[in-house]
Amino acid sequence: MILKKLSVLNYKNILQSEVIFSPKMNCFFGNNGMGKTNLLDAIHYLSFCKSHVNTPDSQIINSDQDLCVVQGNYDYEGREEEIFCAMRRRQRKQFKRNKKEYDKLSEHIGLLPLVMVSPADADLIRGGSDERRRFLDLIISQQDKPYLHALIQYNKALLQRNTLLKDQSMDASLYEVLEMQLGMYGQIVYEKRKKLVEDFTPIFNEYYQTICGSAEEVGLHYISQLEETELAGKLAMSRERDRILGYTSSGIHKDELEMTLGGYLIRRVGSQGQNKTYLIALKLAQFAFLNKRGQTTPILLLDDIFDKLDASRVEQIIKLVSENGFGQIFITDTNRKYLDEILLAMNHDYALFRVERGEVQPMEE
């Protein structure tokens, strides 16, 4: 899959831009705050109907404007695809595929597989468990529609049960229906998350060791209450306690993904360089996983990934992304030197752009 052209209007600080891309490597350089990350975020938006950092749509629209438009023209295995998104303040956003609007945004997820690596990924290590669950959900949802459906239905039932709890409702029949749904959909989510972690961890370990050049092992450990008990029954037993708390205290929305380095939690023992390497390896493994199981090669977005890495690790990453297994790549950096090194290391078509004050200018070499 190739993104051939991106048209942007009022996406954060990018007021108006139309960019034609290389089918292989696209490099963007410029100072911080100029719009490099926003450009990659607009590409991410076309795949997931949302910002990489979960920015509300109202904050995506340029602060001086009322309308934001993002459109991408893709070559999808020889087939033309046009994806269009328009957002207006205080209105429902439009999301269209080939000029036909989606009934549900969830129908779009997985069509345009994409992996983004950015400084915001640090929250996977230092943030709460919801960040790590979201990471698992994002991988599975791109290649498994039944999983996405189960996750959406689980969250709907969870919201309804929490509303009953806050309202101090005593309607046992309503609780029973919702707890049955939570149990059924929660079991689907649990089993698929568990299987993903089992299949994904060896790939992740291989990428980490390749980048850092050592045999130090990394690990992912999925911890869930469903390992020991059936959810619907547990919810029925904890109903009175949950009513006092005002929320549902058990379920797959409480699951944890432990991330370890050398057998210890990385958030406790990892240096800045180790954390950065860990996250890059995690995302490159995500790319490899999706590429192997999907119908088309994902797009890879690499946003400012070389900061806080020593020269040997930078060299290994450049070598990895220069390999033929990676499809179309978009990479940003304030330091053009790293971008030039990547372009020298690979024998592929490329495009180089300068980003300044929200304007994207192609560079003639």
Curated annotation (Swiss-Prot):
Q: Which SUPFAM superfamilies match?
A: P-loop containing nucleoside triphosphate hydrolases
Q: Which GO terms describe its molecular function?
A: ATP binding; single-stranded DNA binding
Q: Which Pfam families does UniProt cross-reference here?
A: SMC_N
Keywords associated with the record: ATP-binding, Cytoplasm, DNA damage, DNA repair, DNA replication, DNA-binding, Nucleotide-binding, SOS response
The protein's matches in InterPro entries, at most eight in alphabetical order, are given as: DNA-binding_RecF, DNA-binding_RecF_CS, P-loop_NTPase, RecF/RecN/SMC_N, RecF_2
The cross-references to Gene3D superfamilies, in alphabetical order and at most eight, read: P-loop containing nucleotide triphosphate hydrolases, RecF/RecN/SMC, N-terminal domain
Q: Tell me, what is an example of a GO biological process annotation in this record? A: double-strand break repair
In the record, the note on similarity to other proteins reads: Belongs to the RecF family.
- Protein name stated in the entry: DNA replication and repair protein RecF
Organism equals Parabacteroides distasonis (strain ATCC 8503 / DSM 20701 / CIP 104284 / JCM 5825 / NCTC 11152)
| Name of the encoding gene | recF
